[in-house]
Regions:
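N-terminal, charged low-complexity regulatory/assembly segments
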Residues: 1-52
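Proline- and acidic/polar-enriched loop/turn elements at helix boundaries
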Residues: 12, 63-65, 151, 171
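Short coil/loop linkers at secondary-structure junctions
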Residues: 6, 57-59, 145, 165
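C-terminal structured interaction module
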Residues: 149-182
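Short, conserved micro-motifs enriched in small and acidic residues
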Residues: 35-39, 146-153
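Non-catalytic recognition/regulatory regions in large multidomain proteins
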Residues: 124-129, 139, 145-151, 169-174
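Amphipathic interaction/junction segments at domain boundaries or subunit interfaces
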Residues: 37-141
Length: 182
């Protein structure tokens, strides 16, 4: 809506090719990686930014991503983080990944997400930390680091759609040693 139909169409056409290239050139984090969708989703928004030669402002890319999240809000709304069931679902997905990322997997996929549960602020809280983020690492390699803090801000949107509140003090994108989710 901001750039006209012809320009948007050209960028989206280029984006498809760029997206495939980005996925092919990304570090292998495992085909069966339970968190791989996070990187694939982010790359679908990095692609038009790269395809436009960074002529689309990062804030516009963030808005595109935010709108897509609201478009599938029904999916996130199925989980209510205010209920025991919702908290259990959230924890289950994080624990599933933590169990998947064994020392053998870490050797095989050293640049994948690293998750831990160090420093839980409140007993019973949904809390974890990401201490290595392949999305940030790849953004640095691609020269699009400016997108990362904006993408991280969208974690709050996802948590809000799950009827929760994200309390965050650190992100790797902002120079922190980890991203905290609480």
């Amino acid at each position: 809506e901001k750039y006209g139909k012809q320009y948007a169409s050209e960028i989206m056409k280029k984006s498809k090719r760029v997206y495939r290239e980005l996925v092919e050139q990304a570090d292998d984090i495992g085909d069966d990686n339970p968190m791989a969708y996070n990187e694939l989703f982010a790359l679908s928004f990095v692609a038009p930014y790269v395809a436009s030669d960074k002529n689309i402002p990062p804030e516009t890319v963030q808005e595109m991503m935010r709108r897509s999240l609201y478009h599938i809000k029904w999916y996130f709304a199925k989980t209510d983080l205010n209920t025991a069931k919702g908290k259990a679902e959230n924890k289950k997905s994080v624990v599933k990944y933590a169990k998947w990322y064994t020392p053998e997997k870490e050797t095989q996929y050293p640049t994948s997400f690293k998750v831990d549960f160090v420093g839980q602020p409140h007993e019973g809280a949904c809390y974890y930390r990401i201490t290595c983020c392949p999305i940030c690492t790849y953004a640095d390699k691609l020269g699009v680091r400016e997108l990362m803090p904006l993408f991280c801000e969208l974690d709050e949107v996802m948590i809000t759609l799950q009827h929760g509140v994200l309390h965050r003090e650190h992100t790797i994108a902002d120079g922190g040693e980890y991203c905290d989710y609480y």
